[in-house]
Amino acid sequence: IARRQRQMCIRDSDDVILRYFLKAKLPDRLVEDFFTFFDVVKSPLAIRSSSLLEDSHYQPFAGIYNTYMIPYLDDKYEMLRMLSDAIKGVYASVYFRDSKAYMQATSNVIDQEKMAVILQEVVGNQYGDRYYPSMSGVARSLNYYPIGDEKAEEGIVNLALGLGKYIVDGGMTLRFSPYH
C-alpha cells in the first residue's frame, strides 16, 4: 500500500487518485455509528479534514484539502453513500495535485501528514431548495500573532458570514480571542 501511495503522489491525476479511494471500503463498524448519527443530525453536513499540517506554525495548510458538503436526506442509505464518498474524498485530497504542490512549496513531506476527518452539522436557514449557513469560523488553540494583552496560549477565532471562503481566502473576518 505504501508503495502504491508513493506512486500516486508522483504521477496520477486527481481523478485517478479519487477513483482509487472511492473503491476502498470503510470499516463495517462505522456503518451503525453513521446511522445513529443520521438519527440525531437532521441538517446538511460539512465533511472536512483536521490534520497536523493544517495547524503548522509557519505554513498552515488551512483550505488546502477538500471539504465536501452533503445535503440532509430522508434516505439514510443514500446519506451513507454520500458520506462515505466524502470521507474518502477528503483523504484522497492529500494526494491531489494542488495539495502536493503546496506541500512541496512549503518543504513538507507527505509522510509527515496525519489526518482525521470531521463531520460538522451545517447550521443555517433554508430558503426554497437552498440551505445557507449563518456563520463560519476557524478556532486555533494557539495565537501566533497576539495583539495587545492577548497571549499565544489563549487561542484565536476568526468568524465570517456564510461559508468559510472569506476566512480561507484571507478576506475580512471578525478576529477575537475567547479570553478577551
Descriptions of predicted regions:
Residues V16-I17:
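Low-complexity, highly charged intrinsically disordered N-terminal segments
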